[in-house]
């Protein structure tokens, strides 16, 4: 920004050196105001045949800094009782007053009292009175928008109006049809001035509503429908608090014609009024006179259509190509069974999530309906293999083999191995005692090479003889103790598997598996139930799948699956991130918390440590140039404009701002007008060196005006075709001793 301003200063200085020799007194002061065309059909406060009185105290005495339009003191109306300011001010429909000075083009064109209006731009040009030194505007028959807006013959007359008023010509105005003139309109001008405390005045005479605010304080209060009334304001008389010398203030002018019985206006001021034109070219405008919500409409519900920010387009240069479009981001659905999407015709919508049978690797199968919290529900395809499951790939389940189970048990060749879906790996003796004959033991030979030779029957005839005539428990084998003594021994029932309960009953040896319920499985190395997490996998990226061991009242152990929704923000210290988990779109997703600025002059940002929006004053930069002043306007945001300088003799000299250099600080100086106005003595001739040190009024970037030499200023104005003429050098209004009226001022023109 600073570099752009420096470059502009260099360019303007070269212009000044080429064309400037002296200052000339501006003959006009031109500003672009907004005219809001009105019609009694849309707003019956116009052409209303109520009383015609000058009515004070209709509007609030303090102008809202953000709205910058007058507001009624009351919305009450008592027509029958004929009381109250709104009655005497013929404000019979107070709720529509807000559309006197604000755009309402989107209101219904077919309905009565919809408040619809038609904003138009108008150049308000004040002419220098070289005798008084004031800038004046005077029209006895003032119709600035004849043939325009609602008065344009091409405007489509609402059918309801034709039905209600079949004999009244829309274009001749409904209140009387006295002429083709457009009597129903309101003018708004928001501007600024620097108060120099040198006798500045603001004088007005006209009919119907006139309200003028200085420093957002009501100083001219001529409300209601009335004949021409006068208000003369000496700024030095403004108190509570008084205006401060060399301070910049707002000047806001509001004027309405509401009845077809005359239209006159006369304005005279010595204020050095200036503007920061918006991209519509309107003095201190907010852009709404040429860009509204409908201007940038692209008929795509999936885009956010906005007018450009103030200052992003050169003054008066707005086109629809400057509109700003951004993509609508549809909010993430908390319902996992709905998927958000944007329809170009209808905007954000949702569609049901289609739960496909089988996920990407085909290892899961859908069951049941979609769960609003968890989304699509899937069963692990390989759950049927229970504790023999080793996972899934490409839809193929991997199952424990006998070889793998053999490894778990140490590859003992005396057993046959397999995997049981409930028990996991199990083994069976190859040399079963049930195959043994009487008085023999079936033993296993580990070192043989042929499986057919693995089992060998060993005779225990001697032991049988010792127990002859004795009853031996079926779970025991005969044995000998002392000579001739029968001493049975227990059968070997241990299968060396810690995950089985070995038992012999009535001679039958059993190996009952240790029961581990749910998602638990017995660890063959420890004999304890341990978790088996794969069983709990629900194929949902938004859940944490865990298996926990729970002891039942009977002492048994069960594994319980848990599919807790994942907290995406658990490891994020930035609380400005808004997290959600979309099971149908990759899992955790975050968006930054958006803090809306509460006003144009406050910037709101999210504080990462708290997640709260924190407001701070907006900083407005003017590049450090002495001849530029920046401020934040509650309605417009950051604006940058030229510094106004008071001259030593306002009638004979112009106040000129000189930017600082490396060796000299910026300052204001006085330069004689050339030619000098009548009555001014010849003074020092301004040098090229002085001119080269200043800046002229010009638009830079965000509607910036740079001040300086008058010739350079005139050169810029000639090329711009339209401008704020004389903003830097209006001569002082010369007061008389009788109530502030200039003796040479022609009062007959009022």
Curated annotation (Swiss-Prot):
Highest taxon of source: Eukaryota
Segments in the Cytoplasmic topological domain: 710-750
Region (Disordered) location: 727-750
Signal peptide, first to last residue: 1-22
Record's bilayer topology term: Single-pass type I membrane protein
InterPro entries: Fibro_Slime, PA14/GLEYA, PA14_dom, Prespore-cell_inducing_factor
Glycan attachment sites: 129, 447, 506, 554, 571, 659
Any Gene Ontology CC annotation: extracellular region
PROSITE patterns: PA14
Listed Pfam families: PA14
Keywords recorded for this protein, A-Z: Glycoprotein, Membrane, Signal, Transmembrane, Transmembrane helix
Residue stretches spanning the membrane: 689-709
Compartments, record wording: Membrane
Ranges of compositional bias, category Polar residues: 738-750
Family: Belongs to the prespore-cell-inducing factor family.
PANTHER family xrefs: PROTEIN PSIA-RELATED, PROTEIN PSIB-RELATED-RELATED
Protein name: Protein psiO
Annotated organism of origin: Dictyostelium discoideum
Chain's gene name: psiO
């Amino acid at each position: 920004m600073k570099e752009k301003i420096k470059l502009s200063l260099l360019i303007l200085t070269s212009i000044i050196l080429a064309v400037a020799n002296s200052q000339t007194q501006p003959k006009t002061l031109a500003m672009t105001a907004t005219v809001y065309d009105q019609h009694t059909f849309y707003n019956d406060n116009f052409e209303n045949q109520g009383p015609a009185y000058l009515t004070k105290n209709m509007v609030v005495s303090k102008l809202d800094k953000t709205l910058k339009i007058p507001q009624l003191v009351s919305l009450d109306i008592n027509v029958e009782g004929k009381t109250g300011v709104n009655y005497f001010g013929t404000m019979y429909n107070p709720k529509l007053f807000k559309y006197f000075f604000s755009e309402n083009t989107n209101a219904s064109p077919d309905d009565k009292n919809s408040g619809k209006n038609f904003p138009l731009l108008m150049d308000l040009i004040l002419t220098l009175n070289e005798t008084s030194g004031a800038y004046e505007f005077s029209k006895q028959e003032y119709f600035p928008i004849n043939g325009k807006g609602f008065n344009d013959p091409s405007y489509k007359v609402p059918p309801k109006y034709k039905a209600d008023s079949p004999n009244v010509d829309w274009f001749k105005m409904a209140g009387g049809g006295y002429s083709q003139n457009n009597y129903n309109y309101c003018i708004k001008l928001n501007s600024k001035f620097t108060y120099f405390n040198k006798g500045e005045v603001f004088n007005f005479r006209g009919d119907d509503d006139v309200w003028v605010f200085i420093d957002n304080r009501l100083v001219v209060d001529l409300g209601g429908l009335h004949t021409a009334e006068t208000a003369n304001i000496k700024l030095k008389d403004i108190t509570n608090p008084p205006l401060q010398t060399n301070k910049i203030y707002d000047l806001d002018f509001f004027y309405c014609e509401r009845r077809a019985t005359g239209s006159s206006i006369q304005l005279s001021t010595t204020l050095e009024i200036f503007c920061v034109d918006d991209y519509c070219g309107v003095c201190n405008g907010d852009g709404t006179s040429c860009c509204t919500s409908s201007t940038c409409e692209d008929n795509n519900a999936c885009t956010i259509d906005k007018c450009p920010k103030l200052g992003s387009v050169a003054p008066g240069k707005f086109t629809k190509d400057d509109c700003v479009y951004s993509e609508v981001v549809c909010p993430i659905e908390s319902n996992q069974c709905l998927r958000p999407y944007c329809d170009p015709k209808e905007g954000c919508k949702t569609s049901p999530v289609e739960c496909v049978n089988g996920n990407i690797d085909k290892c899961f199968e859908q069951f049941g309906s979609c769960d609003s919290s968890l989304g699509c529900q899937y069963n692990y395809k390989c759950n049927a293999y229970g504790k023999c499951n080793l996972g899934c790939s490409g839809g193929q389940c991997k199952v424990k083999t006998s070889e793998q189970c053999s490894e778990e048990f140490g590859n003992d060749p005396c057993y046959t191995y397999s995997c049981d879906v409930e028990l996991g790996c199990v083994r069976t003796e190859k040399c079963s005692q049930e195959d043994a004959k009487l008085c023999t033991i079936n033993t296993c030979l580990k070192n043989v090479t042929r499986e057919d030779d693995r089992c060998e029957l060993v005779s225990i005839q001697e032991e049988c003889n010792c127990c002859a005539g004795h009853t031996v428990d079926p779970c025991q084998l005969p044995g000998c103790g002392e000579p001739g003594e029968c001493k049975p021994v227990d059968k070997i029932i241990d299968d060396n598997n810690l995950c089985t309960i070995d038992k012999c009953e009535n001679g039958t040896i059993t190996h009952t598996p240790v029961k581990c319920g749910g998602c638990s499985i017995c660890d063959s190395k420890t004999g304890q139930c341990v978790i088996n997490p794969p069983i709990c996998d629900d194929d949902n990226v938004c859940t944490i799948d865990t298996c926990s061991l729970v002891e039942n009242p009977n002492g048994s152990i069960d594994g319980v699956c848990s599919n807790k929704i994942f907290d995406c923000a658990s490891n994020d210290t930035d609380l400005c991130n808004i997290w959600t988990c979309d099971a149908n779109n990759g899992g955790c997703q975050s968006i930054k918390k958006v803090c809306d600025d509460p006003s144009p002059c406050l910037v709101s940002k999210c504080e990462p440590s708290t997640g709260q929006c924190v407001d701070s004053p907006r900083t407005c930069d003017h590049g450090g140039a002495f001849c530029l002043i920046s401020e934040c306007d509650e309605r417009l945001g950051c604006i940058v404009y030229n510094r106004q300088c008071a001259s030593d003799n306002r009638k004979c000299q112009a106040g000129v701002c000189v930017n600082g250099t490396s060796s000299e600080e910026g300052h204001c100086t006085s330069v004689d007008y050339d030619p000098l106005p009548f009555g001014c003595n010849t003074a020092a001739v301004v040098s090229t060196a002085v001119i080269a040190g200043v800046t002229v009024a010009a638009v830079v970037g965000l509607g910036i005006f740079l001040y300086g030499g008058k010739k350079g200023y005139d050169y810029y104005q000639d090329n711009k075709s339209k401008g704020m003429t004389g903003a830097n050098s209006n001569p002082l209004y010369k007061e008389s001793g009788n109530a502030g009226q200039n003796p040479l001022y022609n009062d007959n023109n009022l």
